[in-house]
Amino acid sequence: MACQIQASRVFPVLEIEKGLSFMINVFHRRIKASSITLTSFPYPMKSFQIRRPNRKIAFALDTGSSIPGDSGEGQEMNGDRTGLGSTRLGRIAIAGGKQLLGKINSARKNFPMKIFLLLLGFYTANALATILGQTGDWDVLVAGIVVAAIEGIGMLMYKKPSSSMFSGKLQSFVVFMNFWKAGVCLGLFVDAFKLGS
């Protein structure tokens, strides 16, 4: 008896239908015998489909507050009473994700310049440690100047913002100097480890 069995599998697919309902096609098999052809299981195919009406997709990387619907309009996340946004923990997670993405997007501004200043600060610390290690006469004076510069930049960077103290360009300059300061601190930290070993 020759019997031919052919099975085909459709991988789980997430489809969005009208009304934002989910349909998950779990699998579909087709068995063919020589004289008998079965096109489905004894149960209808609808038993393998899971429908969840009124569900909305929460995108992890979306910074907007709306989800595009079928008509292209946005629907507010605050009105969502199902899914992640329905609990207090979900709302905290969504707000934290939006804040994190905002900070990541603001850090991307002038990213090459920030990396350059970080590496320049690292090089400055290595040059200071090498030159001052050779002479040995200026150690205390230069260490005091470096500490004063680091503390001054930190004071300008992290003090409470006043109404019109800084213009935009001066604030940007202080942010860039803060990256240079971070490079100097990192370089001195690495040199201290080299001397300790």
From Swiss-Prot:
Top-level taxon of origin: Eukaryota
GO BP annotations, alphabetical order: nonphotochemical quenching
Cellular component terms (Gene Ontology): chloroplast; membrane
InterPro entries: Uncharacterised_Ycf20
Transmembrane regions listed in the UniProt entry: 113-133, 138-158, 173-193
Family: Belongs to the ycf20 family.
Protein location: Membrane
UniProt keywords, alphabetically: Membrane, Transmembrane, Transmembrane helix
Record membrane topology: Multi-pass membrane protein
Pfam families linked: DUF565
Organism of derivation: Arabidopsis thaliana (Mouse-ear cress)
PANTHER family per record: PTHR33787, YCF20-LIKE PROTEIN
Protein name: Ycf20-like protein
